């Protein structure tokens, strides 16, 4: 049976009727049966031949599925024009459908809700296409610009700075002195023999690279000139652009020696001249260089650290120390020193320990002026909580007595008094957070006074504030908030006062509004001279599901005291299937006495609440609305309003803040109810 089936498949040919159909479509009415049979055999052979060639292409492509491209290649191999049209990269999953005697294959597309398309915000406008030219090479050298890759990566700069012997140097060959030193330094021929000395004198002479002057190109010299002039110039816009270029340009590796020398010499000259502005500009240059991710400043720290520390502990940085704010420069430079210690301090260079020793030595000295004392404390405090705990807290009592002797003693110098005040503020600022972590609550001023002296009460108050601020920040971190950036439309219905019963009104909010805020304001005449009875409070609640919306009709009744008449105003509210925001508006305005009717009236306050469905989008059952409290409970403390009746207002802006006048002139007499957190 298997052999017969294979034989049947191998002799499969097209039916002769198909040839007749093709001939009739071409205008040939009568064709003989023998001719149809010959054409059928020929077409079947050609189709099988093309299929075999296509299978060969499939096998050569190491694929398991035959594609249309294989058929095209087979047709091209036979010099047959291939089929033209659109080709899909993936197989299209067609679905089959039949009905009415017809068979149809179609591509199933995903159904898209029209409301989703309408409510989807428009995408951002794409940027315009622009072309920018830059130099790939100038005289055979690649320029160091942001468009080109950096000439030396940061890892290579670090390797050259920390391990210069391991980096490949030009002029040193494989059989040079480095290789001889590495192989012959620890070589031993046998037991009992002494180690051979390094063959430095026996081998070939050293090939020393001649000292060359590192010259900058004309473009780099021009860039250096423009950058330095802009950084210390008078134009703030150019200075900002220059600092941004220093912080982001990847091609400044060759100009780092010039920049470090410029900063070092600039600080040395301007400290003598007490030029505070230029010192600030130079420190901003240091900050920009440290922010550049492509630069490694290890080889230039020996020039930058003295310049920065000079701006911290210098006795005088400006011409008028009692007026100019040189304290901000000392704080900024202290943060720079802390950043340098964080990035470049190792167990080999001990940068942080040496800087800490310098600051401590200047602070402990009794003859140190208050400006230098402030800078030393700021530099130590910026190094971290461990430094504060170890070096600053044990000396708080002595420093507090020194500060008290200046502030409470006879006035010797206004500069000393200002400096002592700044030192006291600095100590309270940095020590309070550390003490809040070290000491358990509660905080007692007597205990602080006994441990820290005159600074104890002030430290206690600052520690209490630090604890409260930390607790507030923890609450803000743990609280989940939802920020809604879409505009909130407000729909307000105002009715004019009528002597007779009010007519029913219908209020509907369209479902296309994303987050509606519904506000119903009941208008009445001016307040009567006698005190009005407590108003009636109505709460309208509705729940919505993903399939349909829930409508509730609530009759609002107002009755004048002492009369038997009752006014009924049913309001029907349609809530869309989204989560609206609860909005409460209650206003009251006194009309002129000439237009106010004599009869008393009542006031209504409406709260519209819509609860989201429990399993929205997941097929879960909708949530049930909360029970509506009776209208007679919880009288409202807010009054009504006299508005221009018969006008419907719809706005796209958020509702006004409490206490602001509305567009129709009415003002709220009491605070609105707080909006619940979403």
Swiss-Prot record:
Query: From the Swiss-Prot or TrEMBL record, what is one GO molecular function term?
Result: DNA binding
Q: Which residues form the signal peptide?
A: none
* Positions with biased composition (Low complexity): 542-574, 633-646
Residues modified to Phosphothreonine: 120, 248, 660
Composition bias, Pro residues: 622-632
Entry keyword set: Isopeptide bond, Methylation, Nucleus, Phosphoprotein, Transcription, Transcription regulation, Ubl conjugation
GO BP: any one term: DNA-templated transcription initiation
- Database matches in Gene3D superfamilies: Histone, subunit A, TAF6, C-terminal HEAT repeat domain
**InterPro entries recorded for this chain?**
ARM-type_fold (IPR016024), Histone-fold (IPR009072), TAF6 (IPR037796), TAF6_C (IPR011442), TAF6_C_sf (IPR046344), TAF_TATA-bd_Histone-like_dom (IPR004823)
Task: Enumerate the subcellular locations listed in this protein's record, separating them with semicolons.
Answer: Nucleus
**Per the record, which residues fall in region Disordered?**
142-201, 524-574, 611-678
Q: Omega-N-methylarginine: which positions carry it?
A: 524
**Is the keyword Cell cycle assigned to this protein?**
no
Per UniProt, location of the Glycyl lysine isopeptide (Lys-Gly) (interchain with G-Cter in SUMO2) cross-link in this chain: 196
Modified residue Phosphotyrosine is at which positions? 253
Similarity comment: family membership: Belongs to the TAF6 family.
Task performed by this protein? The TFIID basal transcription factor complex plays a major role in the initiation of RNA polymerase II (Pol II)-dependent transcription. TFIID recognizes and binds promoters with or without a TATA box via its subunit TBP, a TATA-box-binding protein, and promotes assembly of the pre-initiation complex (PIC). The TFIID complex consists of TBP and TBP-associated factors (TAFs), including TAF1, TAF2, TAF3, TAF4, TAF5, TAF6, TAF7, TAF8, TAF9, TAF10, TAF11, TAF12 and TAF13. The TFIID complex structure can be divided into 3 modules TFIID-A, TFIID-B, and TFIID-C.
Name by which UniProt lists this protein:
Transcription initiation factor TFIID subunit 6
Taxon lineage:
Eukaryota, Metazoa, Chordata, Craniata, Vertebrata
